[in-house]
């Protein structure tokens, strides 16, 4: 479990400046449209997940007339407290943890899992299985370090095998190699997805 002890914002969407100390339990954000409730959640997600809550681009977070934004959060997980600061400008992001620049974000993401659920995620229930697999993969990234590499290698093998099948002169031996790679990494991916699915229940 992750606890956010404090959050400081400077230039994030509608917030020019804010200091917030959430309570230790459930926090309710109440207010009219456009007052900044979602922006607060987006700031927390950016601090923990290192990317925006809605989409992937950082530019929309910067208020009109500004060139950059900044947030700082003091969080605690696994009995370890750390300060995470994120500075962002047009197309750029700089992350520091305990005042040291973070060069490998994956190291931090493994320690603080955050999986959001927003109204636009209703397609998880109403849509096809692809969206649900994506959610399982997002969850798995935090708990199983090998999952991202398994997915990368699976997609690589799939692309190579499909290209081989489309070619007029396909090598049966090479086709067998890629098929075995698909089976190998596909089995690992399915096992991890099943494990994460059981945890959701």
PLM segments and residue spans:
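Pre-Walker A-like glycine/lysine-rich segment at the N-terminus of P-loop NTPase domains
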Residues: 1-46
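Short, flexible helix/strand-to-coil boundary loops that buttress conserved ligand/catalytic motifs
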Residues: 19, 65, 151
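Generic alpha-helix structural propensity
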Residues: 24, 35, 39, 56, ...
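Alpha-helical structural signal
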Residues: 37, 42, 58, 136-137, ...
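Regular, well-ordered alpha-helical segments
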Residues: 46-49, 163
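Nucleotide-state sensing region of NTPase/ATPase domains
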Residues: 48-131, 137-147, 198
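An accessory alpha-helical subdomain
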Residues: 123-201
């Amino acid at each position: 479990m992750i606890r956010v002890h404090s959050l400081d914002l400077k230039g994030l969407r509608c917030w020019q400046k804010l200091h917030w100390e959430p309570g230790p339990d459930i926090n309710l954000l109440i207010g009219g449209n456009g007052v900044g409730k979602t922006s607060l959640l987006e700031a927390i997600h950016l601090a923990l997940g290192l990317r925006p809550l809605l989409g992937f681009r950082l530019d929309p977070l910067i208020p009109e007339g500004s060139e950059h934004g900044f947030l700082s959060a003091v969080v605690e997980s696994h009995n370890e407290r750390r300060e995470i600061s994120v500075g962002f400008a047009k197309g750029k992001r700089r992350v520091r943890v305990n005042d040291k620049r973070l060069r490998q974000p994956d190291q931090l993401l493994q320690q603080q899992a955050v999986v959001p659920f927003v109204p636009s995620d209703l397609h998880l229930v109403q849509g096809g299985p692809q969206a649900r697999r994506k959610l399982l993969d997002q969850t798995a990234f935090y708990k199983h370090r090998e999952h991202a590499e398994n997915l990368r290698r699976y997609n690589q093998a799939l692309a190579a095998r499909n290209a081989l099948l489309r070619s007029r002169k396909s090598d049966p031996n090479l086709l067998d190699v890629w098929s075995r790679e698909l089976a190998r990494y596909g089995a690992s991916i399915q096992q991890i997805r099943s494990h994460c699915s059981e945890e959701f229940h």
